[in-house]
């Protein structure tokens, strides 16, 4: 059996530290340029260096996305960026995730000691393509999202055994082929292939065919329109044995725009599912209700297995709404205690003294607790923490640890903007 890597996203230094603590084997991040998540917080070079050092201290690898489809004017900047990564101290990133052949060759020239992984944006759909990238010096290829497990297993059997295969196993699905979308360009002038996607696939649409009056296309809709591009979220937590059988090395979680609560929950759950299965398939099956309960505790759009078991049916789409299911509200991350035994936090959503909340721990435990006190930075007691990103100190009826996450159960649906 090949060694399994759990690869998780991080939008910021704070989230990187969380996913490292909550079970990731590797983390993928974006710098301030040349990745495909321009709206994410992303990392400055200083933050990236600190994040790489933190991850390496915990035995976790870090991959940096540079997967834009480059234009002529990008190439000099790419070279400068890779030179900075090459010179990063005390540690460099472990790999670059690249889609464009020109960007790949610049990386090979400027920072040959950093591994090169080929992004799903490169539309990697056959074993000849994988071998092509291997011959050019790639150590890993990310599968196109449109591949079935059968096809991935066939690829595994035809390529060099040293080459690694990475596959998205959980998260939001793009409606376009391997993420190469022009809807955002067309409607808003913002280039999805340069990291500026406005997600028009989630908008509300009504279909009109002006040249065919009286002829109605068979689309599903409600009174607000139709959601013909609105895919369910991918979830393979119930199919770990099939992922292993296909020969996949790295199980990738989508979500560089997600909160620390989301990525921590998903990382912790997949970590336990993988470890349970490797310890005992029977234990994995017995714990399946817990995995599903935890996965559904964070925001999601309903689940699908995507293309893994063949061409998706109409059941893969959501036609009647554009809402997330929301199980919990993210309140914040527990920091270090002060001399009075109160724990430092930065507010992510409002909560109040007397509320019952939940302490989410990296080991899988969820501990109910009551908020006993809230104190601002000047030592003044507060009844609540109403201000976004407000720094304060909290006392709970149960003792938390640094990097625990506080959350509040909601169980509601929230509309997407």
Regions found by a protein language model. Give the residues of each.
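Surface-exposed amphipathic alpha-helical tracts and adjacent flexible/coil segments at the periphery
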Residues: 1-22, 26-33, 51-52, 58-88, ...
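Glycine-rich, positively charged N-terminal anion/phosphate-binding segment
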Residues: 38-53
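Gly/Gly-Pro- and Ser/Thr-rich, intrinsically disordered tail segments characteristic of DNA damage-repair
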Residues: 76, 114-127
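Alpha-helix capping/helix-boundary segments
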Residues: 102-103
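Conserved phosphotransfer cores of two-component systems
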Residues: 111
């Amino acid at each position: 059996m090949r060694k399994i890597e759990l690869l998780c996203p991080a939008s910021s230094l704070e989230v990187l530290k969380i996913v490292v603590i909550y079970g990731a084997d590797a983390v993928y991040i974006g710098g301030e340029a040349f990745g495909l998540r321009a709206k994410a917080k992303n990392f400055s070079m200083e933050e990236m260096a600190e994040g790489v050092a933190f991850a390496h201290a915990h035995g976790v690898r870090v991959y940096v996305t540079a997967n834009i489809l480059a234009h002529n004017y990008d190439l000099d900047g790419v070279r400068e960026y890779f030179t900075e990564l090459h010179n990063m101290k005390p540690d460099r990133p472990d790999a670059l995730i690249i889609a464009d052949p020109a960007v790949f060759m610049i990386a090979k020239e400027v920072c040959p000691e950093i591994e090169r992984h080929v992004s799903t944006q490169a539309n990697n759909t056959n074993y000849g393509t994988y071998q092509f990238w291997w011959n050019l010096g790639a150590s890993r290829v990310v599968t196109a999202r449109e591949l079935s497990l059968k096809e991935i297993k066939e690829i595994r059997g035809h390529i060099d055994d040293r080459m690694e295969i990475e596959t998205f196993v959980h998260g939001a699905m793009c409606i376009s082929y391997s993420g190469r979308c022009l809807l955002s360009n067309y409607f808003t002038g913002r280039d999805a292939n340069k990291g500026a996607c406005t997600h028009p696939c989630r908008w509300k649409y009504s279909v009109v065919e002006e040249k065919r009056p009286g002829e109605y296309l068979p689309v599903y809709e409600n009174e607000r329109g139709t959601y013909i591009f609105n895919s369910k979220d991918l979830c393979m937590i119930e199919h770990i044995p099939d992922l292993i059988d296909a020969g996949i090395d790295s199980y990738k979680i989508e979500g560089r725009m997600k909160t620390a609560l989301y990525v921590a929950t998903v990382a912790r759950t997949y970590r336990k599912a993988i470890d349970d299965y490797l310890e005992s398939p029977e234990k994995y099956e017995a714990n399946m209700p817990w995995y599903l309960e935890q996965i559904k505790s964070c925001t999601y759009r309903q689940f699908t297995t995507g293309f893994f078991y063949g061409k998706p049916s109409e059941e893969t789409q959501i036609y009647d709404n554009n809402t997330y299911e929301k199980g919990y509200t993210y309140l914040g991350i527990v920091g270090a205690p002060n001399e009075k035994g109160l724990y430092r936090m930065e507010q992510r959503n409002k909560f109040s003294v007397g509320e019952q909340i939940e302490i989410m721990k990296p080991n899988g435990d969820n501990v109910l607790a009551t908020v006993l006190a809230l104190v601002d930075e000047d030592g003044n007691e507060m009844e609540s923490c109403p201000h976004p990103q407000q720094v304060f100190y909290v006392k709970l009826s149960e003792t938390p640890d640094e990097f625990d996450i506080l959350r509040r159960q909601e169980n509601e649906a929230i509309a997407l903007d």
